[in-house]
Amino acid sequence: MNLYVLGSSSSGNCYLLYNERSILIIEAGVPFKELNKLHLFNLKKVSGCIITHEHGDHASRVKEYQDKGIKCYASSGTISKLNENVKNISLFNSEDFEVFHFPVDHDASDPVGFYIKSGEETILFATDTYVLRYNFKELTSILIECNYSMDILNENLKNGKLSASRRDRTIL
């Protein structure tokens, strides 16, 4: 199983897990044209797109992906916020990827992380969360997407809520 990162930031998130037969898209936060530019991308191989939560940097391109024939999947709470014909993540079915979702803590409606299995490989994917409440065993890869705000860090430093060394560790 291979990984290609198209975007991991506040302006858009999108990751491709792929093998010789299939592509699994994680997050719908970058334009489809960016996917289509990739030499490894083949629309016929796409198993689907799984989405962690409804925030724009993760889900703003759902309709665009669906218009290209890509089935998108998310949790019930996320589906209720998207106003698109997104399928429940529990319905995702692929010959090459087994996807299990689990709840994470974030300011969204029903955000989830993913435990993905393909052959002998397992990947843990978690984004925009400050804690993972489960223990995962026998992982071959861990993908954690996280951001920070320099303004908030500096404000917390100024107010004594954060030490300078901790702020510096965050930004390095």
Question: What residue spans do the PLM features occupy?
Answer:
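Conserved beta-strand hairpin/beta-sheet module of binuclear metal-dependent hydrolase folds
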Residues: 1-39, 112-128, 141
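Short loop/helix-cap segments at secondary-structure boundaries that form the rim of catalytic
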Residues: 62-65, 79-85, 94, 133-138
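Structured catalytic core of nucleotide-sugar glycosyltransferases
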Residues: 11-14, 54-55, 99-102
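Cap/insert and terminal regions of metallo-dependent hydrolase folds
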Residues: 136-172
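Short, hydrophobic beta-strand segments that form beta-sheet elements in well-ordered domains
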Residues: 24-27, 48-51, 69-76, 82, ...
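Active-site metal-binding motif and surrounding structural segment of the metallo-beta-lactamase
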Residues: 31-77
